[in-house]
């Protein structure tokens, strides 16, 4: 069977490659950044400028983040707090949003791609993260150009499929550049876009409304399942070819239809759950799923609840607050 398939592949560059199913990044290190007291105190003076929903109780935020770390320890999950690796002369105001380590870069099976933050309040995040990645000897395979907006909360990976959301923070320029350069490293790439501009801070990134876990399981905001929703997302699939390039493999379709067509087990979440970052789940190396919302906790069997409501005031959740690199 294998030799026959190989011969068939050699005869046509238009046929897709066959790959082993990619598993989540097992045995790697989660990177985190504990809430910085001085930075949050500065941000509390102008919550709009620093992208907060409202003023944050620093002590509560630090306590909840510490509780998050404790759960990671209990689950045997490796992690590192990068706060001790920050240059000491870094201005505190540049650290207000760095707690959300997810956004400055994405990690694909090919390596680390440094993004390009859209909001001025986060323009320093990339250079700070880049310096830290160098300290950990992590190679950067690409840095997005100025016209290529890319934030890590818009990138998700599951079962050899990359999902990249575009819209409020990441754009098509970045999505297509990674396609052109072959940097996704998965058999399929699904680029997702809204039918109407989306600016709500509750939905700025893909991981705020959708997250896959396990293999072909996912949680998704219920509103996205309605065909006439003004928040509807569309999806275009690209498939890896024998020559290493990606070719569009389907017409744009409703994202929820794409998930159904690809046999995803779909768990829908209410708007209240979505506002509580119910879709912003974090899957650990051991397969356990961490959640921060009661509804999601009930719907994902065996999930672990992590109190995180104070940090939600900064417009982010558990997945937003982590990223990873090769140990």
Q: Where would I find each of the regions flagged by the language model?
A:
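Arg/Lys-rich, intrinsically disordered low-complexity tails that mediate electrostatic binding
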Residues: 1-17, 21
